[in-house]
Structures are given as C-alpha cells and as structure tokens.
Design a protein with these regions (language model features):
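A conserved mid-protein helix/loop that constitutes part of the nucleotide-sugar donor-binding site
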Residues: 14-19, 204, 208-227
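Glycosyltransferase donor-sugar binding loop
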Residues: 34-39, 171, 209, 236-249
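A short, active-site helix/loop in glycosyltransferases that binds the activated sugar's phosphate group
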Residues: 39-42, 139-179
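Short alpha-helical donor nucleotide-sugar binding micro-motif in glycosyltransferases
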Residues: 77, 268-269, 276-281
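Nucleotide-activated donor-binding/catalytic signature segment of Leloir-type glycosyltransferases, i.e.
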Residues: 250-269
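Aromatic "clamp/platform" in nucleotide-sugar-dependent glycosyltransferases that forms part
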Residues: 289
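Short hydrophobic beta-strand element within catalytic cores of glycosyltransferases
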Residues: 306-309
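Conserved acidic donor-binding segment of nucleotide-sugar-dependent glycosyltransferases
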Residues: 321-322, 326-332, 341-346
Length: 377
C-alpha cells in the first residue's frame, strides 16, 4: 500500500511517526510525507525511510496559500497513487482530507492529536471547531489520541461516535520502551550533563519537557518550585524546551527562569537525545491545561520517574492516580504539596516509577499501537 501522511512542520515527524514508518516499510508499505519546507526533512527521510514533498502547510489560515496547498497535495496524491492518506493536526488534517476526498482516496484518516480550541474563546474558538468538523466530515475514519479526546469530541459534536476510534489505550505512535529505559540510560552522558548544569549528588530535580508557555502550566510550575525551594535548597527545576512568543509567559516568570540559580533552562534539545535529560529527573511535572495525549508523561514513566499532572483532557489518561503519580489542580499550592510529598518519600518515588514503567510496557509500547494501526489499514 502507498500511505501518505500530511503534517505542517517537520519537528513533529519523530514524535507522530518516527520508527512506525520503518516498521510499515518492512511490512511492504511505501511511506510518503507532505510537510512544509525544512532542512530536517532530508535527514528524517533517510532515518525513517520515506519519500517526501515540500508543500507549505501553514498553521494560520491563509485562503490563497491553503488552496494552493490543497491543489499541490491533490496532485501528489495522484502522482504516488495513494491508497491511504492521513492528515495530522486540524490544519494539516483539513488540507489532507479535502485533497484526498477530491482524489477519491478510499481510506482517509484524520488523526486528532488534541482539541486546540479548548483554551480559545469567541470567534477563534468557533472557527477552530468548524475546521475540525469539516476535516472530520471529509474523513472515512478519525483517530483520537486518547479516550478523553474521544469523549470530548462527541460532547462537542465534532463527528459521529461510530466514525472515531482510539488506538489501543491511546497515543498516535506509542513509546520506545528500549530507548526510554532507566537500565539502558547512558551513564557517561548523564554524568556529563550533571557537570554541565551543576547538578550535585543529593539534588532533587523537578523536570519538565516541552514548550515553555502558559498552556503547559509553566507559571504554576515555576511558582510552586519557588515555594519548595525556600524549604529545600537542594531542589532544582529543569525546563527542557524553548520559550515561545505564542502564548508567551509573563515577563516576571521569564525573568525568574533566566535568573534563578536553581533553575536549569536548557533551551531546545534534539528529541534524539531527550532520554538523557529524563535520566537526571527525580519527578516529572506536566501541569498542562490541555493535551491530546502527553507522550512526555509516558516517556518519563518508562524511565521510572513518578509523574505529577492535571486532570486536563489527555493528561487524565496518562497516569494512574496514586500508583504511577498524582493528579493536581491548576494551582501552585496543590502542586507544591504534591512535590513535597514526593520529596519526603524516596520509597514512594521508587514504587511509582516502577509501576509507571510497567504501565507503559503493558499498554503503550510501540508495537501495541502499531498493530492497532495495521488493523485499521
């Protein structure tokens, strides 16, 4: 079969697809990707064995450019004789589904990675909902990345329940349990990073990976850290990711991140080495306001790190409360108390870490999700 994936930026390819593409190529498929132009595309195409075409798939609405993207995608679908087209994210999904519908592709999959409208309001929210509804209408099947996204999709009238599925227990790609493993962690690399960031023996490292924006709960995380740091000078906060202009943090929080000696702000880190950073963490925190399915939580759990997260869409599916981590409210005091509880109990951290690893192995390893995709195809 000839399978085409449409994404808007190359950055997501290792997360959304990655070795899944290699796996399907070994089974006889030909894999193709449409993506906005990027220097990384050539490297990714060799790593993951796919052919690609660069087409501007913009995140923002631009009627002229969007129509050109639909036409270019349509022509590429015809050129490669695609049997299956999968569109990722609302904008990539809409362009992919419209082009595939026009080309009469028999299997058109819209992969709903989350509900981007959840934290939007007014006209913008209405527009985002209708983009999602249109992509859903043009698709023959919709994959929701988590049970909570699936439930909310029905509540918000995005599509009929009969049209959507969740792959196994969720995610779009699963987790590489061999790579994300405490036992397989590169000790030399971890020690080098500890020296680089000044992490000493006995330090308690609170970790986060992702975009440093309001939606991720970074304001609450920084303020909870400040409070617990007053009590324990060995507490460090490691923020692995970049500050962004879109949904930017307040000036005072940015100032704290840049100037607080206990905060390690790494900037951009290649996904290829992200496990080396997890290996430095004692607890992983994601106080997010919305997710599709936070794979970072599963990666941390696979590394035997206890997790603190919220009951937001997506996040609520990512831990077992009291067993692999704790749920907290979007409240810095609640988060501080959960951090204090884990700080005080090394044995609890160890037990939660082991339970988290087992959960990922049982329900979220790559092969579980890939087999579900194969059944759908």
């Amino acid at each position: 079969m000839n399978v085409l994936h449409v994404v808007n930026i190359s950055f997501v390819i290792p997360y959304f697809l990655g070795k899944q593409l290699n796996w399907f190529v070994e089974k006889g498929n030909k894999e193709y990707v449409i993506c906005s132009p990027s220097e990384e595309l050539e490297k990714f195409s060799k790593d993951y064995v796919f052919e690609y075409k660069s087409i501007d798939v913009l995140r923002k609405i631009s009627i002229g450019k969007d129509l050109r993207a639909v036409w270019s995608t349509y022509r590429y679908i015809k050129e490669i004789k695609a049997d299956i087209v999968t569109g990722h994210t609302p904008k990539g999904g809409l362009i992919a589904m419209l082009a595939a519908w026009l080309a009469r592709v028999p299997v058109r999959i819209y992969l709903r990675h989350g509900l981007v409208y959840e934290t939007s309001h007014g006209l913008k929210r209405a527009l985002l909902i209708n983009i999602d509804r249109l992509a859903s209408r043009l698709a023959t099947k919709i994959i929701c990345v988590s049970p909570s996204v699936a439930r909310r999709s029905i509540e918000d009238g995005l599509n009929p329940e009969s049209k959507q599925i969740v792959l196994a227990h969720g995610t779009c790609n699963g987790i590489d349990i061999e790579r994300f493993s405490k036992q397989e962690a590169n000790a030399d690399a971890s020690n080098a990073l500890k020296r680089q960031f000044g992490i000493r023996e006995g330090d308690f490292v609170i970790g986060f990976t992702g975009r440093l924006v309001r939606d991720k709960g970074i304001i609450e995380l920084v303020r909870a850290y400040q409070e617990i740091r007053k009590l324990h000078q060995n507490v460090r906060l490691m923020l692995v990711g970049m500050l962004e202009i879109r949904d930017a943090l307040p000036v005072d929080v940015v100032k704290t991140i840049k100037e607080d000696k206990g905060i390690i702000s790494t900037g951009y880190v290649e996904y290829a080495i992200i496990e080396q950073y997890y290996a430095l963490m004692d607890v992983y925190v994601l106080p997010s306001y919305r997710e599709g399915f936070p794979t970072s939580v599963l990666e941390a759990s696979a590394m035997e790190i206890p997790v603190i997260t919220t009951r937001a869409t997506g996040c609520c599916d990512s831990i077992i409360d009291g067993e692999t981590g704790f749920f907290v409210n979007h409240d810095e005091k609640d988060l501080e108390q959960a951090l204090q509880r884990l700080y005080d109990a090394p044995s609890l951290r160890e037990n939660m870490g082991k339970a988290g690893r087992q959960m990922v192995v049982d329900y979220f390893r790559h092969e579980v999700v890939w087999n579900a995709i194969e059944e759908l195809y």
